[in-house]
Curated annotation (Swiss-Prot):
Example GO BP: L-leucine biosynthetic process
Residue ranges crossing the lipid bilayer per the database entry: none
A molecular function GO annotation: 4 iron, 4 sulfur cluster binding
Encoding gene, per UniProt annotation: leuC
Protein name: 3-isopropylmalate dehydratase large subunit
Domain of life of the native organism: Bacteria
Cofactor(s) in the UniProt record: [4Fe-4S] cluster
Alphabetical UniProt keywords: 4Fe-4S, Amino-acid biosynthesis, Branched-chain amino acid biosynthesis, Iron, Iron-sulfur, Leucine biosynthesis, Lyase, Metal-binding
Pfam families: Aconitase (PF00330)
Function: Catalyzes the isomerization between 2-isopropylmalate and 3-isopropylmalate, via the formation of 2-isopropylmaleate.
Subunit structure: Heterodimer of LeuC and LeuD.
UniProt record similarity statement: Belongs to the aconitase/IPM isomerase family. LeuC type 1 subfamily.
Cited PROSITE patterns: ACONITASE_1 (PS00450), ACONITASE_2 (PS01244)
């Protein structure tokens, strides 16, 4: 009987399998950062253990780091302690670290792929829920807890119960102006935030195959937002072209051998999934969230829903609470919602393709006078490339802020936060209460919607903008 892509990758990494117990998986790449690693290293120290495979471990500073004045001491004492602790632990245990000021520093899920460390067929873990990003390369990648971080550091293995498999087939092609972010937000609204629970999801179909690697990473990044254990996409020529020539990619004969193996990483024709979902990309439009979880979303052309329309009492109560927290009334057109801050960045949409798309829309225009635009590249390499292309000048001339690399406003763990009651249009992945700062109100959007919103000051798409030079 045939196997799915996920089953092939999983089976290749089983070190031990005992009936009634979780499989013991070998881990090919372990990514760590300053927030979820300190206790794990303490555990190693207390037990007198070393890091078993420091060569398969990569650390970077991203969650707590400032995106301004990164060359100065970190002001927040908690953030400074976590960053300093990571540096000491990396030095003591021989782990490769890319700290602030290093040309390879950045968000861990941006750095791994851009270095070529993320490759098809791998198992990849990190103490971060958006590790699923790396599944875009045909890898099984998922977030783990701090105790599991310690286990991987000590043994390079991890006990895991084998999840079920699901196929999400996206037929057709995305219309112009509709992005991978709109696709995945549409999917989450369709399934709910628990629709993928217990599954490794394979995204497939014509619309997925047409996506760039950056777009595929956006889709896989948000797998956890609808409850999936992991999300992955079969590698193809787009994947190989992205990896080839990167610093950690195979070279010469090793490259040829790697590609030959990677081409086998596809779901067999006679394989079966435990569940299948089919969507039509051609019907999709720009999509935005209105509530306080990623599943509470509607097309940009829609309105805030009436909580009374929900048949399920728990959904109705959740909608009522979301409207209250977000300061919205049912029936309000999404395009009428005023935004205070626009954030373009994060491990979801902070890559060079995202910045190019934003700059193309913003060029020759001015940010709305009552709106702040914050553009944060996902890594130093992305920042330098954007500057080489003059993208930073476009953002600054429009009245936006051009920052250093880091997680920034995706989460309220660094200086880039919303104030209570402040409303954002954000290209990040979570819109929970307080996610971007206590009392902050977050609308998840695509890069084109974010850029257009910065210009108009209300939730908008590029189609809503006047032509450059028309005023």
């Amino acid at each position: 009987m045939g196997r799915t892509l996920a089953e092939k990758v999983w089976d290749e990494h089983v070190v031990r399998s005992t009936p009634g117990e979780p499989d013991l998986l070998y881990i090919d790449l372990h990514l760590i950062h300053e927030v979820t690693s300190p206790q794990a290293f303490d555990g190693l120290r207390l037990a007198g253990r070393t890091v078993r495979r420091p060569d398969l471990t990569l650390a970077t500073e991203d969650h707590n780091v400032p995106t301004l004045d990164w060359d100065k001491p970190i002001a927040d004492p908690v953030s400074k302690t976590q960053v300093d602790t990571l540096r000491r632990n990396a030095a003591e245990f021989g782990v490769r670290l890319h700290p602030l000021g290093d040309v390879e520093q950045g968000i861990v899920h941006v750095v791994g792929p851009q270095l070529g460390l993320t490759q098809p067929g791998m198992t990849i873990v990190c103490g971060d829920s958006h590790t699923s990003t790396h599944g875009a390369f045909g890898a099984i990648a998922f977030g783990i807890g701090t105790s599991e971080v310690e286990h991987v550091l000590a043994t390079q293995t991890l006990p895991q119960a084998k999840p079920k498999t699901m196929a999400v087939t996206v037929e057709g092609s995305l219309p112009d102006g509709v992005t991978a972010k709109d696709l995945v937000l549409t999917l989450i609204a369709h399934t709910g935030t628990g629709g993928g629970q217990g599954y490794i999801v394979e995204y497939r179909g014509p619309a997925i195959e047409e996506l760039s690697m950056e777009g595929r990473m956006t889709v896989c990044n948000m797998s956890i937002e609808w409850g999936a254990k992991a999300g992955l996409i079969a590698p193809d020529q787009t994947t190989f072209d992205y990896i080839e020539g990167r610093p950690e990619a195979p070279k010469g004969a090793d490259w040829d051998a790697a590609v030959a193996h990677w081409k086998t990483l596809v779901t067999d024709a006679d394989a079966t999934f435990d569940k299948e979902i089919v969507l039509d990309a051609s019907t999709m439009t720009p999509f935005v969230t209105w509530g306080t979880n990623p599943g509470q979303g509607v097309p940009l052309g829609g309105s805030v829903p009436d909580p009374a329309q929900y048949d399920d009492p728990s959904d109705r109560i959740a909608a009522e609470k979301a409207c209250e927290y977000m300061g919205l009334e049912a029936g309000t057109p999404m395009r009428d919602i005023k935004v205070d801050t626009v954030f373009i960045g994060s491990c979801t949409n902070g890559r060079i393709e995202d910045l190019r798309a934003a700059a193309e829309i913003i060029k020759g225009r001015q940010v709305d006078k009552s709106t702040r635009l914050l553009v944060v590249p996902g890594s130093v390499r992305v920042r330098l490339q954007a500057q080489d292309e003059g993208l930073d000048v476009i953002f600054k001339e429009a009245g936006g802020e051009w920052r250093g690399a880091g997680c920034s406003m995706c989460l309220g763990m660094n200086p880039d936060t919303l104030q209570p009651g402040e409303r954002s249009a954000s290209t990040s992945n979570r819109n929970f209460e307080g996610r971007q700062g206590k009392g902050g109100r977050t609308h998840l959007v695509s890069v084109p919607v974010a850029a257009a919103t910065a210009i108009r000051g209300t939730l908008s798409s590029p189609a809503d903008l006047e032509p450059v030079g028309s005023n």
